């Protein structure tokens, strides 16, 4: 049969040839150990075949031969940092609602944009509606099922493995919403993964356990006064494993002046109750609030990391932004508030990052709010990078969990661990004995996996954890996502590090804590992993009796 000449081919056939040529060049570059600029290759190859449009990334990904998928997918993945920690994060927003403390303080916090009564009226509290997550939520009319399905589809098209999902429930104080709405919202998150239509939260969780796409955790944003015993019990029922608590400042006068509507004592209580229930605690902190100043800001972060009443597991650092329609905007306009200069802010963030202990993870260093909406505050979109560069100039290292993760190190610095060993760090926090176990390469300061073990205090209110129980609050092996049922020798997930960490945790609980039982706060989708190693479900926890 006579082969068609290039001029006889249709645009669709030319596009297929272009895609094949792009993949061939990628394979050759891989075999020669060369780095390749994908955009340049796409442009050049499309021009070679006389096409005005480049081939889409989605089509290239779909056409990669099976034997080359493992080596080429990391090169084709858009924004590889999204799944570098081993999990695809899906942020969803609940419907707009008023801040719960308006009823007794008379107003919202002075710096807070958004909400039903704000200039950004279709946005949720503390968001403007122009953040990427907000815009996705508005497009889906705040429907939790659609938000989840759309985001997962988007991540898949960009070449990410969406085998494990962690939800972040954003949009103000979720736990202040009516119970009926909360149940509907969480039920739909689980149903979006499992494909089942549930009648209640218990049914949704049951089907989510066996879902192909695993829900390995749910994070809920809340306030210290909505983090009490009944709220924590409800969140455990939902399959929530991590809390993001809005602290903002450890100073009582600042909390009062900014109209927070809760005390610092409430912050300490909420941390204690949350950790004794097994939750991981991430704090939101805001440097550059009114009436603080640089030195006082540094002092509060020193206090925050060193005082056992605080010591969070994670931190989101949100330098104060002046946004129109807020009380702070009026103070700024009248000259009664002035933001730090850009250089002072970079210096401050660098000094804060230098204080972070190796068991704390810094999740974010600034808000996602678009710069045109910011009247005063952060002027750079890459504040974390600038702060890390400043630390490098000063000869200081940032030793938080995220900076040392194996997946992040591989993407940013192309370094891989060489000699891995077990490292143990013990500290006291919120009335309990904490042990941070990790597998690390100490020479290169790379973290492969971690486990947080706590000897619960006697004040724990959950009956499953009473009478001397140790709880594993987090088990995480880092590196790009590897599906739960498979192994990849070049990735660090599913290579046995998780099992080794669990064995050491059980030994410490039995021999050092003197515990007769160990519990795990497990994401709904990872419960079967613990069943395989001898755990059973008791309430929301996976538990095992220790001999």
Swiss-Prot record:
UniProt-recorded name of the protein: Elongator complex protein 3
SUPFAM superfamilies in alphabetical order: Acyl-CoA N-acyltransferases (Nat), Radical SAM enzymes
Positions of acetyl-CoA binding: 164, 474-477, 497-499, 530
Binding positions for [4Fe-4S] cluster per the UniProt entry: 99, 109, 112
Source species, domain of life: Eukaryota
Lineage: Eukaryota, Metazoa, Chordata, Craniata, Vertebrata
Keyword Iron-sulfur: yes
Post-translational modification Phosphotyrosine, affected residues: 202, 251
Result of altering residue 318 to F: No effect on tyrosine phosphorylation
Post-translational modification: Tyrosine-phosphorylated; phosphorylation on Tyr-202 does not affect elongator complex integrity or ELP3 protein stability. Also serine/threonine-phosphorylated.
Keywords: 4Fe-4S, Acyltransferase, Amyotrophic lateral sclerosis, Cytoplasm, Iron, Iron-sulfur, Metal-binding, Methylation, Neurodegeneration, Neurogenesis, Nucleus, Phosphoprotein, RNA-binding, S-adenosyl-L-methionine, Transferase, tRNA processing, tRNA-binding
Assembly with partners or alone: Component of the elongator complex which consists of ELP1, ELP2, ELP3, ELP4, ELP5 and ELP6. ELP1, ELP2 and ELP3 form the elongator core complex. Interacts with alpha-tubulin.
Species the sequence originates in: Homo sapiens (Human)
């Amino acid at each position: 049969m006579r082969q068609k000449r290039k001029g006889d081919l249709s645009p669709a056939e030319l596009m297929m040839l272009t895609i094949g040529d792009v993949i061939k060049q990628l394979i050759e570059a891989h075999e020669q150990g060369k780095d390749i600029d994908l955009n340049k290759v796409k442009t050049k190859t499309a021009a070679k075949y006389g096409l005005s449009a480049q081939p889409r990334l989605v089509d290239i990904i779909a056409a990669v031969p099976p034997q080359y998928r493992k080596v080429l997918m990391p090169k084709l993945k858009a924004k590889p940092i999204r799944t570098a920690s081993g999990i695809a994060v899906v942020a969803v927003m609940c419907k707009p609602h008023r801040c719960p403390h308006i009823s007794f303080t008379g107003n919202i916090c002075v710096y807070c944009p958004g909400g039903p009564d704000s200039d950004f009226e279709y946005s949720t509290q503390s968001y403007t509606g122009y953040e990427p997550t907000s815009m996705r939520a508005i497009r889906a009319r705040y429907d939790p099922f659609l938000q989840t399905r759309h985001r997962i589809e988007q991540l898949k098209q960009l070449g990410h493995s969406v085998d494990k999902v962690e939800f972040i429930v954003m949009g103000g104080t979720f736990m202040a919403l009516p119970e009926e709405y909360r149940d509907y919202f969480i039920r739909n998150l689980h149903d979006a993964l499992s494909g089942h239509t549930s009648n209640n939260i218990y049914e949704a969780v049951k089907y989510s356990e066996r879902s192909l796409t695993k829900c390995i955790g749910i994070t809920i944003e809340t306030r210290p006064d909505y983090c009490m015993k009944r709220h924590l019990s409800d969140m455990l029922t939902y399959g929530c494993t991590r809390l993001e608590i809005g602290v903002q400042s450890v100073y009582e006068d600042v909390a009062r002046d900014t109209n927070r509507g809760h005390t610092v004592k409430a912050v300490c209580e909420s941390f204690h109750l949350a950790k004794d229930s097994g939750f991981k605690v991430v704090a939101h902190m805001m440097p550059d609030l009114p009436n603080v100043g640089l030195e006082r800001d540094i002092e509060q972060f020193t206090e925050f990391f060193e005082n056992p009443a605080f010591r969070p597991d994670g931190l989101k650092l949100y330098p104060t932004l002046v946004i129109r329609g807020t009380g702070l905007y009026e103070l700024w306009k009248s000259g009664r508030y002035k933001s730090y200069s850009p250089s002072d802010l970079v210096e401050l963030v660098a000094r804060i990052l230098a204080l972070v202990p190796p068991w704390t993870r810094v999740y974010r260093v600034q808000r996602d709010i678009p710069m045109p909406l910011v009247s005063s505050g952060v002027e750079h979109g890459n504040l974390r990078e600038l702060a890390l560069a400043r630390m490098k100039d000063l000869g200081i290292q940032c030793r938080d969990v995220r900076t040392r993760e194996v997946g992040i190190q591989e993407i940013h610095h192309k370094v891989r661990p060489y000699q891995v060993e077990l490292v143990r760090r013990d500290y006291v926090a919120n009335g309990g004995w904490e042990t941070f176990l990790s597998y690390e390469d100490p020479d290169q300061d790379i973290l492969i996996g971690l486990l947080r073990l706590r000897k619960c205090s006697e004040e724990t209110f959950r009956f499953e954890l009473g009478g001397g129980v140790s709880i594993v609050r987090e088990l995480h092996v880092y590196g790009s996502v590897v599906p739960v049922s498979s192994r990849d020798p070049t990735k660090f997930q599913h290579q046995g590090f998780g099992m080794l960490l669990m064995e050491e945790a059980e030994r410490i609980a039995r021999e050092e804590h003197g515990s007769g039982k160990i519990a795990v706060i497990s994401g709904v989708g990872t419960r079967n992993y613990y069943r395989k190693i001898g755990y059973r479900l008791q309430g929301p926890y996976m538990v095992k009796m220790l001999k």
